[in-house]
């Protein structure tokens, strides 16, 4: 029991010391590049009302939606080991078909074209 208490106290002290050093150390060296905000290549000191491409925004949102839907397929190798792999196969097939139909719809509506 005493070994457990010593281990917990030692781990707590070490983690506290490391956290204090991590908060204290970066404040010693401030460079101009580190102290200026940087946001995706845009000048942070310029106007906040810059024109923004709506087409770029729509393509980015479309990418995020498809990316999140594909992330639903990641647990499939583990889901196949369930007692009813046929249900998993049907659900994954439906999800892939939904992705294919969504991509076809975006393609037909010219949502992935940059020029009009």
Curated annotation (Swiss-Prot):
This is NADH-ubiquinone oxidoreductase chain 3. It comes from Didelphis virginiana (North American opossum). Its main location: mitochondrion. The keyword Nucleus does not apply. Belongs to the complex I subunit 3 family. It catalyses: a ubiquinone + NADH + 5 H(+)(in) = a ubiquinol + NAD(+) + 4 H(+)(out). The lineage of its organism: Eukaryota, Metazoa, Chordata, Craniata, Vertebrata. One of its GO terms (cellular component) is mitochondrial inner membrane. Core subunit of the mitochondrial membrane respiratory chain NADH dehydrogenase (Complex I) which catalyzes electron transfer from NADH through the respiratory chain, using ubiquinone as an electron acceptor. Essential for the catalytic activity of complex I. The gene is MT-ND3.
